[in-house]
């Protein structure tokens, strides 16, 4: 987009202090701190320069008493945009900036991006367009070849962004939680109660007589010793019963294959040898103790 084809909307000569009262000046200043295209940035800078030059030429520059530059600020020689001649030595250090001009605050930025400033800009844009081409107001309403106004679009976009930031900041700052608060208790320092391992039972459900069994997890990791439940009085496994059950379940289905029977018998012999070895180890361990 080229600025050569745009209407001359930046050369207004303000003869009064209306630009300070409708907050358009501060709206343009805040727009400069947001991302924008070079064309839009040039338009904003040109308009601010025009306002600044007009304030320097006119004597009617009585800025409101609550401006953030302080009571000792020289409005003519120290204009906000005249950075080369601006000095802040006379500003008292203990002076607090007014809440209406806190650019980094998402809660107060909406006061600068007001819909009133957008309406004023629309009126000025329409007036300049009619004066430039000497057209009646009806032509401006019905003319489809009116060039786009990127500054107006940027002001509306900034107003929408500021409202979103207010909602987002309110949610994020409603309550600040520590990182440890969001973790499950079984993953915190309470694992030391379980000898450094992950606690299988959530600490948030303490064991008591009032709690039901449905509150606890169904799967609890436990690896008992295989010899804990064995005793000298336990009965031995009847291998004949095991062999009969294996043969009866598989012999009828594989009666025509003799190798299947041999395989089953070998498995039974291996099972018998394994049980006997476990039994002998158990007896020897009891005698040693």
Curated annotation (Swiss-Prot):
Residue numbers spanned by region Disordered: 80-101, 136-157
Biased composition (Polar residues): 80-96
Record's protein name: Uncharacterized protein L237
Native source species: Acanthamoeba polyphaga mimivirus (APMV)
């Amino acid at each position: 987009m080229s600025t050569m084809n745009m209407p001359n909307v930046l050369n207004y000569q303000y003869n009064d202090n209306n630009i300070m009262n409708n907050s358009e000046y501060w709206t343009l200043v805040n727009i400069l701190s947001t991302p924008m295209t070079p064309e839009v940035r040039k338009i904003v800078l040109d308009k601010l320069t025009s306002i600044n030059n007009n304030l320097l030429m006119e004597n009617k520059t009585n800025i409101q008493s609550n401006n953030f530059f302080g009571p000792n600020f020289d409005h003519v020689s120290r204009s906000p945009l005249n950075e080369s001649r601006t000095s802040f030595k006379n500003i008292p250090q203990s002076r607090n900036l007014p809440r209406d001009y806190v650019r980094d605050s998402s809660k107060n930025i909406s006061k600068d991006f007001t819909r009133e400033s957008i309406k004023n800009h629309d009126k000025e844009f329409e007036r300049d367009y009619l004066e430039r081409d000497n057209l009646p107001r009806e032509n401006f309403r019905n003319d489809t070849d009116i060039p786009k106004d990127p500054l107006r679009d940027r002001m509306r976009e900034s107003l929408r962004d500021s409202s979103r930031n207010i909602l987002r900041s309110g949610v994020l700052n409603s309550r600040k939680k520590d990182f440890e608060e969001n973790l499950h208790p079984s993953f915190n320092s309470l694992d030391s109660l379980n000898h450094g391992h992950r606690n299988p039972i959530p600490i948030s459900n303490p064991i008591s007589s009032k709690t039901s069994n449905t509150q606890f997890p169904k799967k609890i990791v436990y690896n008992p010793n295989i010899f804990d439940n064995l005793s000298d009085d336990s009965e031995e496994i009847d291998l004949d019963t095991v062999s009969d059950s294996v043969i009866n379940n598989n012999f009828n289905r594989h009666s025509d294959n003799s190798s299947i029977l041999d395989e089953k018998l070998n498995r039974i012999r291996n099972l018998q040898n394994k049980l006997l070895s476990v039994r002998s180890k158990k007896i020897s361990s009891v005698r040693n103790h």
